[in-house]
Every structure is written in structure tokens, then in C-alpha cells.
Swiss-Prot record:
It comes from Clostridium sporogenes (strain ATCC 15579). InterPro entries: CsxC, DUF7852, Exosporium_prot_C. It is found in: Spore wall. PANTHER family: DUF3794 DOMAIN-CONTAINING PROTEIN, EXPORTED PROTEIN-RELATED. It comes from the Bacteria. GO terms for cellular component: exosporium. Its main location: other. This is Exosporium protein C.
């Protein structure tokens, strides 16, 4: 039978373990940590085909920085005391080139129309005013994420004109029936054009579709807090008006066949389409 001191010691030990377990549960802990060794390797020099060679590579058609002005109004889920931080990212959902919708000189396109669509994704961190007492305002830091869409059309000037292919005019060959007993299985037998048979020729040229790359973006923004109201003597807001100037830089490319030749000077390679 355990004495009173032993029972008290076991109780204190169990209480300490329980408190220690709760502390780790609330604060977190390091599950595992290890130092990784260095793995040795061998540097390999890549091999390349000898020039001259014909390669199919992306060719830059145009590159442009486009300015897009956006104004948006949003209502947060709850009233906020102040905006703490706003993180922004830009995404494109459409970048379509109409290659022959611009200026054409001597049959060669000089400019084209570029249709852009996308959105600015904003993560807004704001502080609430849950407890207001005298000169102290306490609350929580919360966040919300929104997508502000934009769309525009711009004209790009070609650095290299795109390769285009048009459908040729259909060629039709009529056949002649020169005998009354022509075995063409037509309803009537007559001299002249063979009405129940003909030859057709279509010429279809397929080319690579131009595509875009988003190189970067700059955003200038003004956030105007609207519809203020007072709670416990402190001003809080319910609505946010955003004015943004978005500069996006896009590059338009097309896969084209390019002849790559060595230069005599040895300064690099020369490309010829």
C-alpha cells in the first residue's frame, strides 16, 4: 500500500506531464530535424548538333508594356479598423493575337491587335475593432482574397512578322462526256459536261499559333476607405474603393523554322529564316 507522500509524488508527476502535454499541444514542437549530407556529382558538357542546321524555335513577334486602369469597389465581410497589408499578383486568362487586324504594307503585316484579359488577385489583411476602451483599441487581424478582373485591346508592332497561311481557292475540274452511251449512270444521256462526277482540289496550310508570355507587372494603387461609422467612439469602415494603374509586360511569340549558321568571326551563331 502506497504512503501519502508517494501518492502525492505520483499526482504531482502526472500533473506535470499533463501540463507539459498541453503546452506542446498549444505551442507546437519540432517533429524532426536532420542535416543532409553533400552528394557528389559530375559536371557534364552537353553535346550539340553541328551547324548549319534548321531548327524550330520560338521567335519573338512583339513585346509591349500595356497600361490598364482599373477601379473596383468591394465590401468586406465585417467592419474594419484599418488596412494592415495588401499583397497583389497579376494573372492573364486570355492573350489572343489577331495577326492581320492592323496595318499591312505590300502584303506584309506591320501591326496586329492583341486582346488581353486577366485579373489582379489581392489578399487584404485588416484589423477589426472588437474591444474599445478609453485610449485602447483591440481586435483581430483577418484577411480576405478577391479577384479584380480587367480586359483591354492593344495594338502591337511586329519585330518579326508572323508566318501566316491562307486557305487556297478551291480548284474544280469538270469532266466531259463525249458519247451518248457514256457509262456515268446519270438519269439522262447527253453530250457535254459530266454532271454526276467532278474533281475537287483544296489547299490548306496550317501554321503555328502565336502565344504569349507574361514577363512582369507593376501596380500603382490607391485604397479609399468609404462609408465610415462609429462604434464605441472609434471610426470603422465598411467599404473599400480601389483605384489601380496596372502595367503588364507581355511578349508575343511564334514557333518558326530558323536556319542557324556559324559566323566567320566566331562571336556566336547567325539565324536566317
Amino acid at each position: 500500500m502506497m504512503s501519502m507522500d508517494e501518492m502525492r509524488g505520483n499526482y504531482d508527476s502526472n500533473s506535470y506531464k499533463s501540463a507539459d502535454h498541453d503546452c506542446h499541444k498549444d505551442c507546437g514542437r519540432v517533429i524532426e530535424s536532420q542535416t543532409l549530407p553533400l552528394c557528389e556529382g559530375t559536371n557534364i558538357t552537353p553535346t550539340a548538333v553541328t551547324t548549319p542546321v534548321v531548327a524550330k524555335i520560338p521567335v519573338v513577334l512583339a513585346e509591349k508594356e500595356v497600361q490598364i486602369d482599373v477601379e473596383a469597389r468591394m465590401k468586406l465581410k465585417e467592419k474594419f479598423f484599418e488596412i494592415k497589408r495588401i499583397k497583389k499578383d497579376v494573372f492573364l486568362t486570355q492573350c489572343e493575337l489577331l495577326p492581320r487586324a492592323g496595318v499591312i504594307e505590300n502584303g506584309v503585316p506591320i501591326t496586329g491587335k492583341l486582346f488581353l484579359s486577366g485579373f489582379v488577385r489581392k489578399n487584404i489583411e485588416f484589423a477589426t475593432a472588437d474591444c474599445v476602451k478609453h485610449d485602447v483599441v483591440s481586435g483581430e487581424i483577418k484577411h480576405t482574397t478577391e479577384k479584380i478582373p480587367f480586359t483591354c485591346v492593344t495594338e502591337v508592332t511586329y519585330i518579326t512578322p508572323p508566318i501566316l497561311g491562307n486557305r487556297g481557292i478551291q480548284q474544280k475540274t469538270d469532266l466531259f462526256c463525249g458519247r451518248c452511251d457514256c457509262e456515268c449512270e446519270c438519269e439522262e444521256e447527253r453530250l457535254g459536261k459530266l454532271t454526276c462526277e467532278e474533281f475537287l482540289e483544296d489547299s490548306i496550310t496550317l501554321v503555328e499559333k502565336p502565344f504569349c508570355e507574361l514577363l512582369g507587372a507593376r501596380i500603382f494603387e490607391a485604397d479609399i476607405q468609404r462609408k465610415p461609422c462609429y462604434e464605441h467612439g472609434e471610426k470603422v469602415f465598411d467599404e473599400l474603393l480601389e483605384k489601380m494603374v496596372v502595367h503588364i509586360r507581355v511578349k508575343v511569340l511564334q514557333l518558326q523554322q530558323v536556319a542557324v549558321n556559324d559566323t566567320d568571326a566566331g562571336t556566336g551563331s547567325m539565324c536566317r529564316k
